């Protein structure tokens, strides 16, 4: 009966408090449910009267041990005052507990509990009710009492906390950094109270605007307007400023201004700066009284009107300082750190190859307009060599052939000196470009009038390159690009791979042709037209020829751009063609006379040429707009043919390359190009001459060609020959003709 009643009694308060306790009361026995209820109440109350629960069931011998724990940690005397029970039962419990304390035996307590079981059955029921209610009801009672006790504290604490918080928010120290409150101020430094009440840390304390206004009015450092809508920091206006009073003024005279009977006493009078004097008073009212006295009664000082004003303690607004303590400091540190990473970190942390790369790339995040080679970005880095090393393998090899190719059009337009200056630095950079001049062969042939085949030009290239290597270094230094040759040789070789096979063929042909030409060098070339006109006296029967040569030079300059270049070509042509005629007409001493005899005199060798020359003259007269003497028309026809050949430059160069395999076929192809400016063999009549005449001319032509192609080779292909070498060779060719004359 008691266990069932105990289960019911324990289940009722648990159903009110915790649903889980009800389930446990149905599932468990009475003493177990009682123990659960006791254990729940133990940490909160440490109640001693719960020892009575062990006496409810005679089988509950185990709970005597827990009584000892309760006694050890119990405060029985203090808790008894809060119980709502009959006074007899707690005293019994206390006596039993004291008995336990005195004896220290749980068996005695259980015997004492078993003796009055029949008498105390009803009392135990009531006591269990009281105990259960004492287990659960005192908790809300204590909570209520604690809440009732803490509520006045909480009402006082939030008020004090709110007072301190508002005082801090409107203090001058905070307003110096709180940009939000400063932005909400009007001209009189008033801030709406609603703005202050909406601050987060004030909302947490209170949302009652009336309470906030009341607290603000109680603050001594804050001034609230009459309506209670605005608040501002207290204007500490205790200093009167006197302006435009010199520093040399005695302090006694300034103090005498404020020694009237009705004036309050000032605390301090001192010269501040810039002819300003500060007079400090105790309160703002004293300062106001002194200010009115000066403005209304004194008015003048040292014969000048007094300029006085009250100095309010200004709020030191630092826009660059933090708003709320640490945050803007962190922001400033962050901005400085980000600024430092782009400029100072690369020299500090990096070797020369890692961080400059990143710093070249990272500035694009904060300045997108800069390229990575912009000088202001490059200068902070100590390793400019790395930057050159970074760009040279990717860009410089590509730009160096491009720059050399860009120089081709001016070469084709300008005189020969410009070829010497522009061509050499582009090709003499590295051994790769020197070893592969085929990169530029075809472009040079097409751009420079197709005067000389690439076969003969390459022979001159190798010779002149070997002759004057020091000029290349000077020219390279002049260009300002001193770079490793390996970086540029590789792209040069890479570009020359397309023509490398043809270039090998050309070199083989070049060496074979030079070997065939080299054994017969003894015949010296004859002088040029310029030497004949300027240096030699007129020979017998050559006066008319000189005039025709002058006329030919004028028409040559009018037709072809760059007359000086063509005159150089004409000198080379004369050196080639005159020795051809030399062995057949030994009686003619001068080249001019030879040319006259070749064109006009009925020599037995040239008789078969005359009708062909006449036919060619008829054709050219129909084409030419300036008909003149047969000599001039023949020379003009040469220029017309030369112009036609210039229009067909690419195909003609290809023809030269195809036919250059035969020295016999290449030698007749060369004289037409050489004889464009010359009057000896006009135009392409050399091609139309009979084969015996051509074969008769071949050995002297081969004798003269080894030197001649080198001159004309340098004019189109100046990239391989320095200027000094070209000048020396031209002098060597022009000087020997003086000996036979």
Swiss-Prot record:
The entry's keywords: Acetylation, Cytoplasm, Methylation, Phosphoprotein, RNA-binding, Translation regulation
N6-acetyllysine: residues bearing it: 727
Subcellular location: Cytoplasm, Cytosol
N-acetylmethionine: residues bearing it: 1
PROSITE patterns linked to this entry: HTH_LA
Any one GO BP annotation for this protein: positive regulation of translation
Pfam family, one: La
Coiled-coil residue windows: none
PTM-bearing positions, type Phosphothreonine: 520, 735
Residues the record lists as Omega-N-methylarginine modifications: 406, 421, 495
Compositional bias segments (type: Polar residues): 31-41, 142-153, 452-470, 628-642, 732-741
Subunit structure: Interacts with PABPC1. Interacts with RACK1. Associates with polysomes via the 40S ribosomal subunit.
Name used for this protein in its record: La-related protein 4B
Gene this chain is encoded by: Larp4b
């Amino acid at each position: 009966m008691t266990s069932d009643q105990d289960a019911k009694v324990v289940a009722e308060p648990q159903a009110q408090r915790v649903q889980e306790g009800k389930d446990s009361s149905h599932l468990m026995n009475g003493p177990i449910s009682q123990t659960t209820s006791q254990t729940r109440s133990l940490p909160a109350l440490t109640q001693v009267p719960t020892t009575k629960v062990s006496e409810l069931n005679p089988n509950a011998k185990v709970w005597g041990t827990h009584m000892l724990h309760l006694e050890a940690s119990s405060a029985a005397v203090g808790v008894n005052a809060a119980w709502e029970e009959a006074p007899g039962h707690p005293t019994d419990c206390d006596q039993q507990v004291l008995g336990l304390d005195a004896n220290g035996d749980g068996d005695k307590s259980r015997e004492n509990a078993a003796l009055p079981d029949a008498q105390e059955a009803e009392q135990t029921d009531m006591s269990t009710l009281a105990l259960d209610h004492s287990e659960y009801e005192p908790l809300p009672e204590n909570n209520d009492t604690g809440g009732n006790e803490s509520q006045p504290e909480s009402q006082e604490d939030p008020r004090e906390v709110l007072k301190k918080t508002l005082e801090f928010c409107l203090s001058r120290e905070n307003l110096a950094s709180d940009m939000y409150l400063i932005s909400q101020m009007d001209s009189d430094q008033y801030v709406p109270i609603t703005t202050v009440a909406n601050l987060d840390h004030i909302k947490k304390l209170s949302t009652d605007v009336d309470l906030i206004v009341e607290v603000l009015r109680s603050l001594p450092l804050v001034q609230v307007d009459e309506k209670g809508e605005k608040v501002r920091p207290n204007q500490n206006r205790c200093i009167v400023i006197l302006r435009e009073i010199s520093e040399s003024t005695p302090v006694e005279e300034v103090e005498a201004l404020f020694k009237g009977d009705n004036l309050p006493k000032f605390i301090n009078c001192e010269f501040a700066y810039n002819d300003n004097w500060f007079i400090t008073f105790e309160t703002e009212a004293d300062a106001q009284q002194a200010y009115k006295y000066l403005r209304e009664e004194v008015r003048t000082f040292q014969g000048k009107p007094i300029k006085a004003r009250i100095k309010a303690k200004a709020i030191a607004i630092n826009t660059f300082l933090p708003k709320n303590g640490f945050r803007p400091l962190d922001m400033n540190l962050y901005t400085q750190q980000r600024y430092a990473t782009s400029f100072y970190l690369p020299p500090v942390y990096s070797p020369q190859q890692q961080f400059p790369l990143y710093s070249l790339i990272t500035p694009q995040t904060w300045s997108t307009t800069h390229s990575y080679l912009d000088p202001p970005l490059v200068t902070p880095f100590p390793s400019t060599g790395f930057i050159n090393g970074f760009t040279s393998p990717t860009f410089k090899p590509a730009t160096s052939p491009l720059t050399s190719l860009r120089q081709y059009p001016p070469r084709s337009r300008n005189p020969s000196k410009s070829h010497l200056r522009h061509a050499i630095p582009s090709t003499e950079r590295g051994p790769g470009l020197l070893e592969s001049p085929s990169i530029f062969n075809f472009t040079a042939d097409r751009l420079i009038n197709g005067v000389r085949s690439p076969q003969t030009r390459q022979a001159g290239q190798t010779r002149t390159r070997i002759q004057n290597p020091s000029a290349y270094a000077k020219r390279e230094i002049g260009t300002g690009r001193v770079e490793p040759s390996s970086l540029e040789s590789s792209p040069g070789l890479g570009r020359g791979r397309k023509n490398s096979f043809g270039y090998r063929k050309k070199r083989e042909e070049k060496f074979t042709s030079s070997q065939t030409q080299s054994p017969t060098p003894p015949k010296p070339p004859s002088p040029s037209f310029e030497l004949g006109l300027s240096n030699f006296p007129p020979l017998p029967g050559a006066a008319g020829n000189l005039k025709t040569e002058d006329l030919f030079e004028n028409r040559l300059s009018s037709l072809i751009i760059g007359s000086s270049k063509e005159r150089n070509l004409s000198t080379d042509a004369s050196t080639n063609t005159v020795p051809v005629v030399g062995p057949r007409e030994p009686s003619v001493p001068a080249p001019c006379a030879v040319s006259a005899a070749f064109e006009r005199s009925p020599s037995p060798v040239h008789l078969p040429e005359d009708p062909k020359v006449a036919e060619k003259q008829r054709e050219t007269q129909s084409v030419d707009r300036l008909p003149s003497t047969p000599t001039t028309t023949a020379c003009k026809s040469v220029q017309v043919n030369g112009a036609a050949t210039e229009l067909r430059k690419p195909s003609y160069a290809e023809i030269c390359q195809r036919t250059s395999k035969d020295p016999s076929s290449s030698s007749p192809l060369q004289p037409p190009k050489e004889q464009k400016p010359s009057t000896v063999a006009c135009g392409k009549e050399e091609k139309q001459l009979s084969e015996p005449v051509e074969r008769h001319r071949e050995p002297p032509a081969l004798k003269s060609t080894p030197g001649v192609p080198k001159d004309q080779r340098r004019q189109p292909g100046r990239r391989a020959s320095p200027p000094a070498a070209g000048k020396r060779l031209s002098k060597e060719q022009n000087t020997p003709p003086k000996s036979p004359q």
